[in-house]
Amino acid sequence: MGVAGCGRPREARALLLLLLLLPPLLAAAVPPDRGLTNGPSEDVDECAQGLDDCHADALCQNTPTSYKCSCKPGYQGEGRQCEDMDECDNTLNGGCVHDCLNIPGNYRCTCFDGFMLAHDGHNCLDMDECLENNGGCQHICTNVIGSYECRCKEGFFLSDNQHTCIHRSEEGLSCMNKDHGCGHICKEAPRGSVACECRPGFELAKNQKDCILTCNHGNGGCQHSCEDTAEGPECSCHPRYRLHADGRSCLEQEGTVLEGTESNATSVADGDKRVKRRLLMETCAVNNGGCDRTCKDTSTGVHCSCPTGFTLQVDGKTCKDIDECQTRNGGCNHFCKNTVGSFDCSCKKGFKLLTDEKSCQDVDECSLERTCDHSCINHPGTFICACNPGYTLYSFTHCGDTNECSVNNGGCQQVCINTVGSYECQCHPGFKLHWNKKDCVEVKGFPPTSMTPRVSLHCGKSGGGDRCFLRCRSGIHLSSDVVTVRTSVTFKLNEGKCSLQKAKLSPEGLRPALPERHSSVKESFQYANLTCSPGKQVPGALGRLNAPKEMFITVEFERETYEKEVTASCNLSCVVKRTEKRLRKALRTLKRAAHREQFHLQLSGMDLDMAKTPSRVSGQHEETCGVGQGHEESQCVSCRAGTYYDGSQERCILCPNGTFQNEEGQVTCEPCPRPENLGSLKISEAWNVSDCGGLCQPGEYSANGFAPCQLCALGTFQPDVGRTSCLSCGGGLPTKHLGATSFQDCETRVQCSPGHFYNTTTHRCIRCPLGTYQPEFGKNNCVSCPGNTTTDFDGSTNITQCKNRKCGGELGDFTGYIESPNYPGNYPANSECTWTINPPPKRRILIVVPEIFLPIEDDCGDYLVMRKTSSSNSVTTYETCQTYERPIAFTSRSKKLWIQFKSNEGNSARGFQVPYVTYDEDYQELIEDIVRDGRLYASENHQEILKDKKLIKALFDVLAHPQNYFKYTAQESREMFPRSFIRLLRSKVSRFLRPYK
C-alpha cells in the first residue's frame, strides 16, 4: 500500500463518497409528516430544499408560492441561464489604466512591468527600482517612469549588461575608448571599427549611434497609454485622468465619478432624491457595494470595512494600506519592510529572525559544521576563523601549512626544513644547532672540563637479574660545541600500554639492597630521548581490530667526551670507540631489565613505571592522569606552556625564574641559557626562551645571543631576537643606519612594489612567481602560498589570491553538497569540476541553491549546469552564469544528475555551496507542490530559511529519513521556523495526506 494521500484503494474511495453523500440522500428519502397533511398547506422553500432550477451562477430567492432566480453580481442573464459579464469590454477598459483581466464574476486590473497597482485597484504607479539594491547598478541608478537606467561615474562607461561599469581606455578606436559614441551597446567590428546596438525596447537612430525609446520599454515612460510616433513615444491618459505638464504622468480629474449622475441639480429636494435613490441602489450584492474589501448591508446602506493592516479612507469605501514601519519600526529589531496589508521584519547579515518574527538573534556560525578548519570565534553578526600555529588562514575559513622557509630561510642560518605545521633548522656537517634553534655553532672538539650529567642510568643485580633506573634531571644547560657519542636501543614490552604510572619501588628504596660493588651499569649522559609506540592491531571477532597487546620503547642517549679522558695511549677517536663499547654493554643490560619489567624512570623527582593498564587511585573513581597531566574538574588536562607537572605535588605549577617551557604536557622546565644572570630573567611562567630576558634585540647580535650585544654593522640587518650574527643585504647594498632590523632598511636602487621582490644580483624588481605573493613594498622575498594553494598569475599581492584548485563537496546517497573550488573565497581561473549524483532506487533529488556568485560581465565564461548526462542535448535541470542572491529550490528533472562547473581566465567570484537531498519518490507530488509555490520565496524570512545551514540540515534530515521527524519535538520545530513557514508546509502536507477531506 502506498503512502497515505498518494493513492487509495478503489473500495476506500467508494466508501468515502458514500459517507459524504449519505446524509442528503437520507434526508431526501424521509416522507413528509402525515400528521400535517390534513392541515392548511405550507409554503415549500424550493431554494432551501434544492428544488429550484436556478443556474449555478445565480441566486435563488424564495417567494410565498414559488421562487425567483437572479444572476450573481458579475453575471448577466434571466437567472436560469447566466453568463459571465466582461467588465473589461467597454470604453473605460473596466476603469483600468493598463490591462484589464476578466475573471469569472469579476475582473482585475494589472500593470505593465515597472509599475505597481495603486490602492484603488485601477490606477498604475511607477515603481522606483533604484530603492532596492541600487537597481543592480554598479555606480548610479536613475529612476524613470516605468523603468530605470544605470549610469557610470566619470572615467567609466556602461558595459553591455547595462549594469556594470568599465574603465575607459584612451588608446585607439575601440569599444574601450570613450569616443566610440554609441548610446547603448558597442560591439567590435571588422577592421578595427565599432558597431552600435540598442537595448531591448529601443531603436537605433538614423545616425547609427543614438537609441530612441519605444513603448516596448517601460511603457515608453508613460504612466498610462503609450503610442509610438516618428518623434518617439506619445503619452495619453485614461478618460478619468488628464495629462500632466511633464507629458508623461497622469492626474485624476476633479469631480470624476463612475456613476452617471446629473451634474446640474440645484435643489436640495433633488439632491435628497438622488441620495435616497442611490441608497436603494447600493447593495453588497452589486459590485461589492463599491467597497474595496468587506461590505455589509445596513438599514442606512452599505457599510465598508477594511481588514487588519488597512485603514478606511474618507470616501468610506477605499482601503489604504497602513505603513506599520512608520511607528516604532513596526516593532522590528533591525529592518522593517512594509507590504500590502502587513509588514515583514528582517535581520542584518549574521542574525536570524526568531519565531516572534520581530526579534533578531545572532547566528552562532561556530556551532555549524565545516565553518572553520581549525578554530572559530563567534562575534555578534559575524565570526572569525583562526589557525593553529604553523598554519595560515586563506579563503576566510581554511588553514594551510605555512612554509616558513620561504621568508628569509625561516630565520635559519644554514638549512631550513619545512614540516607540516612547523619547521626546523639544521646545520651542515661540523656544526651544531645553537640554543636559539636557528644559528649554527662550529664543533671545536671537546671541552676542557666535564659538564654536570643531565641523565644517569643505574642498573644493579636484583633477584637474579638486573634492575635499571633511568634518572632525568632538569636545570642543566647543554653546550653545543663538543664531540658527542650517540646510541639507542629499542625493546618490546608485552601487555604494555604507552602510559606511565607511579613506581612501586624507587632508587632510594633499592640502594640498600644494591651495594656499589653489585652495580652492573653506572653511566651518565648529557641527553636522553624516550619514545613509545604501540604494536600492530590484531583482528578480532566480527572483523573488529583489537587494541595492541605490546609496545615498543626506543631510548636514544647522547654522551659528551671530555679532555681528561684522552691519554697518550688513547686519543679522541680511541675514547669515542671505548665509550661506544661501554654504552652497548649498558644498553644490553637495560634491555634485559626491561624485558623482565624491571625498568624504572625518574622524571623531575617523580618515580614512574610503564603501565600495563590505565591505573586508578585505590578507593577513588578519579582517573590517574598521564605524564605531564593534572586534574581539572575531574578530567585529565595537559599542563599548559609555561608550566610543568610536579610529581611530588601531583599538579601543574609555574616554571620558576630562570626556566621556560614552550610545550604542553611536560614534566620539567628548560633552563634559560644564562641561569647565572638571574637579575635579567623574566618572572615565572616563561613560555619560550625569549622570555628569559637579556636577549639581544632585533638589530643586535652577540657571540651567544645575550647581552652585551652589538649593533648590526652597515649593510647588515637582523629581524629576530637572541641571534649570533646579522644578515647581509647582499649585492653590496648599504643600510641607512646601524642596527637595521629588516631588508627594507637596505638602500636599494629601486623600491619594489607589492607583488615583486628585489633581486640583489641584478638590482631589479622581479614579479613574484606563481604560488607566491608579496603584500609589502621593498621586500627581498615572496611568501609561499599556504598548503596546497596557488595563484592564478604571477605578481600576486595578497593572500586572498592564493586559491585551492580542488573541487569541493561531499556526495552521499541521501544528502550531500557540491562546492566551487576555494569556497567561500573566489574560485580560481580555468577551473573545471564535475560531480555525479546517482541516488538509490526509487529516490529523487531535491536541490537548494541558497545563493550563487558568478560574474555576469564574462559573457557566460563561468557557468554551472545540471543535466541528466554530459551530453548537451540531455535533459537540463538547471543552468546559470549569473549571480543570484535570492535562493531557489527545485527537483531534478532526471533521476540522476551530471553537474559541471567551469571558469575561464577572466573575472572570478565567490562561487557556490549547493546542498541536495534524495527523497522517496512517493513524495514527488508533495515536494514539487512546495518548491513551486511562490510563497516559499515571497518573504525575506522564508528566503533566509533556505540560506540557513542548520535549518536546511534539519529539513533534509527529515526528507531523507522521515522517521527522523520524531527527533525534533514540536517545540523545537516552532523555535526553528517562522509561523508562516510552518503554516505553508502544514497546508501542503495536509492536502497531500488527506486529499479527500
From Swiss-Prot:
Keywords: Calcium, Developmental protein, Disulfide bond, EGF-like domain, Glycoprotein, Lipid-binding, Repeat, Secreted, Signal. Disruption phenotype: Mutant mice with endothelial-specific inactivation of Scube2 show normal vasculogenesis and angiogenesis during embryonic development, but impaired response to exogenous VEGF, and impaired response of the endothelium to revascularization after ischemia induced by femoral artery ligation in adult. Glycans are attached at N657. Its main location: secreted. It comes from Mus musculus (Mouse). The CUB domain is important for the interaction with the cholesterol-anchor of SHH. The CUB domain regulates protease recruitment and activation during SHH shedding. This is Signal peptide, CUB and EGF-like domain-containing protein 2. Residues 1-28 form the signal peptide. Expressed in adult heart, lung and testis. It is found in: Secreted; Cell surface. Interacts with SHH via the cholesterol anchor of the dually lipid-modified SHH (ShhNp). Interacts with PTCH1. Forms homooligomers and heterooligomers with SCUBE1 and SCUBE3. Interacts with VEGFR2. Transmembrane segments: none annotated. GO terms for cellular component: cell surface; extracellular space; extrinsic component of plasma membrane. Residues 845-854 are annotated as: Interaction with the cholesterol-anchor of SHH. It holds the Pfam family FXa_inhibition. One of its GO terms (biological process) is positive regulation of osteoblast differentiation. N-glycosylated. One of its GO terms (molecular function) is calcium ion binding. Disulfide bonds join C47-C60, C54-C69, C71-C82, C88-C100, C96-C109, C111-C124, C130-C141, C137-C150, C325-C336, C332-C345, C347-C360, C366-C376, C372-C385, C387-C399, C405-C416, C412-C425, C427-C440, C807-C833, C860-C881. Residues 807-919 form the CUB domain. Residues 43-83, 84-125, 126-162, 175-211, 215-250, 284-319, 321-361, 362-400, 401-441 form the EGF-like domain. CDD domains: CUB, EGF_CA. Lipid-binding protein required for SHH long-range signaling by binding to the dually lipid-modified SHH (ShhNp) and by promoting ShhNp mobilization, solubilization and release from the cell membrane. Acts by enhancing the proteolytic processing (shedding) of the lipid-modified N- and C- terminal of ShhNp at the cell surface. Synergizes with DISP1 to cause an increase in SHH secretion. Probable cell surface coreceptor for VEGFR2 involved in VEGFR2-mediated angiogenesis. The keyword Ion transport does not apply.
